Amino acid sequence: MQRSPLEKASVVSKLFFSWTRPILRKGYRQRLELSDIYQIPSADSADNLSEKLEREWDRELASKKNPKLINALRRCFFWRFMFYGILLYLGEVTKAVQPLLLGRIIASYDPDNKEERSIAIYLGIGLCLLFIVRTLLLHPAIFGLHHIGMQMRIAMFSLIYKKTLKLSSRVLDKISIGQLVSLLSNNLNKFDEGLALAHFVWIVPLQVALLMGLIWELLQASAFCGLGFLIVLALFQAGLGRMMMKYRDQRAGKINERLVITSEMIENIQSVKAYCWEEAMEKMIENLRQTELKLTRKAAYVRYFNSSAFFFSGFFVVFLSVLPYALIKGIVLRKIFTTISFCIVLRMAVTRQFPWAVQTWYDSLGAINKIQDFLQKQEYKTLEYNLTTTEVVMENVTAFWEEGFGELFEKAKQNNSNRKTSNDDDSLFFSNFSLLGTPVLKDINFKIERGQLLAVAGSTGAGKTSLLMMIMGELEPSEGKIKHSGRISFCSQFSWIMPGTIKENIIFGVSYDEYRYRSVINACQLEEDISKFAEKDNIVLGEGGITLSGGQRARISLARAVYKDADLYLLDSPFGYLDVLTEKEIFESCVCKLMANKTRILVTSKMEHLKKADKILILHEGSSYFYGTFSELQNLRPDFSSKLMGYDSFDQFSAERRNSILTETLRRFSLEGDAPVSWTETKKQSFKQTGEFGEKRKNSILNPINSIRKFSIVQKTPLQMNGIEEDSDEPLERRLSLVPDSEQGEVILPRISVISTGPTLQARRRQSVLNLMTHSVNQGQSIHRKTAASTRKVSLAPQANLTELDIYSRRLSQETGLEISEEINEEDLKECFFDDMESIPAVTTWNTYLRYITVHKSLIFVLIWCLVIFLAEVAASLVVLWFLGNTPPQDKGNSTYSRNNSYAVIITRTSSYYVFYIYVGVADTLLAMGFFRGLPLVHTLITVSKILHHKMLHSVLQAPMSTLNTLKAGGILNRFSKDIAILDDLLPLTIFDFIQLLLIVIGAIAVVAVLQPYIFVATVPVIVAFIMLRAYFLQTSQQLKQLESEGRSPIFTHLVTSLKGLWTLRAFGRQPYFETLFHKALNLHTANWFLYLSTLRWFQMRIEMIFVIFFIAVTFISILTTGEGEGTVGIILTLAMNIMSTLQWAVNSSIDVDSLMRSVSRVFKFIDMPTEEGKPTRSTKPYKNGQLSKVMVIENSHVKKDDIWPSGGQMTVKDLTAKYTEGGNPILENISFSISPGQRVGLLGRTGSGKSTLLSAFLRLLNTEGEIQIDGVSWDSITLQQWRKAFGVIPQKVFIFSGTFRKNLDPYEQWSDQEIWKVADEVGLRSVIEQFPGKLDFVLVDGGCVLSHGHKQLMCLARSVLSKAKILLLDEPSAHLDPVTYQIIRRTLKQAFADCTVILCEHRIEAMLECQQFLVIEENKVRQYDSIQKLLNERSLFRQAISPSDRVKLFPHRNSSKCKTQPQIAALKEETEEEVQDTRL
């Protein structure tokens, strides 16, 4: 970045903003880059501003029981805020004084007042000077207030972020990511531009009092008639505003429903294409869009009337003010013109400035109160450690993620010093914890010496992660004692990658040691992966490590933990994403050898790890099921260990699958014995995978899983109203905000039966905001959210004993960020955070306007109609002016007088022109109030938006995956949310306002030109100057706005990234580093925003200067060239003043239109995306009600009796090569093999070898070369949809969209209920569906969060059965499944797909046993294609993964005598069907 010219600018340069000329010149000539932006002034740096506000806030916390954030802000910014407010007031006062001078100028032309004619020129000079003074006062004042608003936002941004890093895990558990994003986006944005309006709360009353005093002098009591009308108008507009909000609130829910489905479609676009659901999804979204547009039109019409009310009110204000006075006393022309000028100022003040100011204060105070509540939430407390301790001890520890009643009691006791409570009462409260919630850990005891390995095992939700959190201090124990040294390193269960290089992610701020670094890289098997990158370990990873596979991310996270030299290493399921071979090697080389002398606590379910551990701790439902060595486990719990070892190849399972088996085993062999499980308990067990309330609750914000991004809306339930909810003070209404929601269902179900909560699940979702649609959080994993927090909101006790010296010393004692700032490179920041640069022009091209206008032919006719009406108005005006000009004046004797004859109503020929000034200037807007022009325009523009949305949706659904893979999901979603919202809401009314203002100006200029042709000559260069200046400014401003928008996303991305890795950050003590990184992102955004504000003010000031010159010319031309006509001078000067304000408004509207049209450009860019080859011919399919569907439906050829293709499922692959992009490197090369009909083929290979890619290539989802034939039919000879319908698919990423069970199983509505129930029965889904109210009509939300992963897999299986496909592709179908659900899938595959060809990608060994052939993929090529016997006889990858003992298990029929003592997994089949269903539920 360059040094800012502002630092060396003179006072004059600062006053006129001339220091921005270099950037304006550069932006006009070439495209601006980040390096062209000026550095921010030191006073605007986030470090300085946050330090200043934090110091004042700490003082406020220390000095008062009820600290107020507004007091801290007042001490920081008040005097500058008031200084600019006074400047603003003085500038507004000049507006009130100008009409006085105008009246004196008109009076000087009075035939009876000729002595004042000589001073008219001096009055003209005074009037011009007032305009100059106003310009010099207003613009610095407005810029100064914007600047202060920006500084307040920066300071509060930083304060919120720092507080977020300090929040306790319990508080984070109760706050959704949406609320944090709302704090940073919705609320704080109000300060930036809103602060300039805040002063009008006191300026407008003073201004109205001054104006009414001046009008009183002219018109006496009748002046209040006009004021009364304005007040009524303001109230009318407020009523319209409330009506508009009502429609918008109703519409918000509909928008949300559409965006939920759209986001699910975008996230699962590969599955949508694999299922051939493009038309079904398009129809579903378009139906929701139709309902949404009905409410959009209503809101737009109300807003249209609200906007028009301002335009037409001018005439009535003047008319109502003047008419009573004229009827009673008569009036002179001077008073009419002076009143007009006063009323223009009065109208703006009462109907615009004051309501805006009140709204600004309301919004700002509400935002400050929300932030204040957030800043007082409970902070994370680090435990006191003994650095000399070498052992880890836990004695009788019990802990709750929920606050216990005893803790609430302690807080209440602190807040009420008068209340005394005995120790007996404390014991009573602590003993009643169980009444309020289940402890996540209870009565845990263990002790491990230095250098020992403790393996922690247990079922999902048993409390394994909570145990590690308690050791780290994230979870406070309610009872018991924890003892360790405090030097901890931590590896999270969900691998977390910070933005930066691989090396920075591993070192993570620790001093660099080359030998240690290389040792860790080798031990974690990262050397081979790093060598593949051109930049080696200096390759920059984006947010969430999106360039890496899951296994690579897991190994980097593990390497980070191992690299840090600590006494205690906490490893939370670090091997979950690794294949069998890699897991074995890393466990041996890293955990057992490299860390042999360190104390380690490893969360695992792998039997091999349990055998090698020094101690084993098995948890079950928060309690210690077993603690001891592995030999003791075998002796004390032989049933447990034999049961685990009885599962075929249990050691080969991933961590998640082993967890599922442990869950089942612990349930059967619990401490209570083998008592039968009641139906209620079984049902509770059924949702344990997705609804566990203890262990999983903390995941709401700290440990996100499954990257599905959705928008959601929630209506507050009574349960939420009682809970800790950030927005609990807001009325019960729908609010929109952007929030990444989760696929998991922990938080959607309260801790009661699903039956009772079923009806409330529909559309009860966390609120979400459209402002965040400009941010790039889309690629990260999503965050869980809470809906059932039921504890009271209790604030922290004030720190009354903290002195100012303590506060300051606390600031100094924190780790400084000076050395950290050197580590952060701005180019790295750009690579880490920024979205893809938009390749659209800086200024909207004429081609975009032309294309937009021609989208709908009606729009062209409407615009022509608008122009015809305007020309008719101008023509009528000119005809009447000509008629009056050629009509002889009335005889003086016919002049009318009032009854008392004291005041004459002067009627002259020129005064009659005033009537037509009103007609030309105002009649245009009066007609707009009717249905002649405005409403058809708004209506048609919304129709254009509807067409563009439909075209874009169709284009995205038909685009090839190679194109979609280059786009971020959030970027696509922004087009459907942010840009479509602009097309629906802002663009139609902005275009209407611009056309309206433009026609008013042209009409006024036409009248002036007729009255005084010389002034028309002066108008031409002004218009030319305006067009040139606008073009010059627009080129730079739009680029700056784009850079500012790109610079905003890193702030929110960094927030989400920090939250995902918060436990890791705290364990490594890297909060100061991330605060500095956050400040860097803030400073980058500030640099762009400050420059945009400065250049905008430069432009506004230049426009005003041009108009001041124009007004000077008009004034002197009219004074010097006009003869005796006071009416002519009055009309010209009044119109000139009106033209100045209106044309400036029109200029700003034109810039707004150009800015909003960029959204149209982005939409056109998506509409122009290429489509997939082999687009199928679509035919309409009549629905049951006989109506034709607007969306074409694909008919399934396999349901026909004369089924021709595919008949057998024979598949031949010849020289198949697959690439992600057309010119990219091949991912698979020269794959050739053939499959016989009905054969089962297993795909083998390491993680990332290309197994899933091969399945995608079969479906033609990639750029492919070569040929595939099914039953002799080549894929080139049929359409893409026909080809894909030949396959049934069970993808790795399960796709459940928001809709009914029926829609999810049969989106094209091809099957009857009986057929769907039959298939549901086959796959074991019937009992699941019957548990829900409405059964098949029950609406699933949040990706089917009320279903376990196994149930979702069964849904996919049911879809494949319904499709009657001949070839079935299965990509990890058993991932995350419990044994019972897995057995059901195996049984269904055998029965329903007995005659089908099955291609299986699976890590479970026993699943592969049923395959006749195996395809081994290595280094992008087929290495082997043989039977399992041949693979085991050779030195193959498959053989390496199988231990000798496992090979014995693979062939029990050959080694029956050796296997008699081994329990078989077939034992599960002995259960009755009821037991199977109950276990699944």
UniProtKB/Swiss-Prot annotation:
CDD domains: ABC_6TM_CFTR_D1, ABC_6TM_CFTR_D2, ABCC_CFTR1, ABCC_CFTR2. The modification Phosphoserine is found at residues 549, 660, 670, 686, 700, 712, 737, 753, 768, 790, 795, 813, 1445, 1457. N-glycosylated. Monomer; does not require oligomerization for channel activity. May form oligomers in the membrane. Interacts with SLC26A3, SLC26A6 and NHERF1. Interacts with SHANK2. Interacts with MYO6. Interacts (via C-terminus) with GOPC (via PDZ domain); this promotes CFTR internalization and thereby decreases channel activity. Interacts with SLC4A7 through NHERF1. Found in a complex with MYO5B and RAB11A. Interacts with ANO1. Interacts with SLC26A8. Interacts with AHCYL1; the interaction increases CFTR activity. Interacts with CSE1L. ATP 2 binds at residues 1220, 1245-1252. A lipid is attached at residues 524, 1396 (S-palmitoyl cysteine). Residues 423-646, 1211-1444 form the ABC transporter domain. Residues 1387-1481 are annotated as: Interaction with GORASP2. There is a cross-link at residue 688 (Glycyl lysine isopeptide (Lys-Gly) (interchain with G-Cter in ubiquitin)). The gene is CFTR. It is found in: Apical cell membrane; Early endosome membrane; Cell membrane; Recycling endosome membrane. ATP binds at residues 458-465, 1245-1252. Residues 1-77, 147-195, 244-298, 359-858, 940-990, 1035-1095, 1152-1481 are cytoplasmic. Belongs to the ABC transporter superfamily. ABCC family. CFTR transporter (TC 3.A.1.202) subfamily. It catalyses: ATP + H2O + closed Cl(-) channel = ADP + phosphate + open Cl(-) channel; chloride(in) = chloride(out); hydrogencarbonate(in) = hydrogencarbonate(out); ATP + H2O = ADP + phosphate + H(+). ATP 1 binds at residues 401, 434, 458-465, 493. One of its GO terms (molecular function) is chloride transmembrane transporter activity. It comes from Macaca fascicularis. It is an enzyme of class 5 (isomerase). This is Cystic fibrosis transmembrane conductance regulator. A motif (PDZ-binding) lies at residues 1479-1481. GO terms for biological process: bicarbonate transport; cellular response to cAMP; cellular response to forskolin; chloride transmembrane transport; intracellular pH elevation; membrane hyperpolarization; multicellular organismal-level water homeostasis; response to endoplasmic reticulum stress. It is a multi-pass membrane protein.
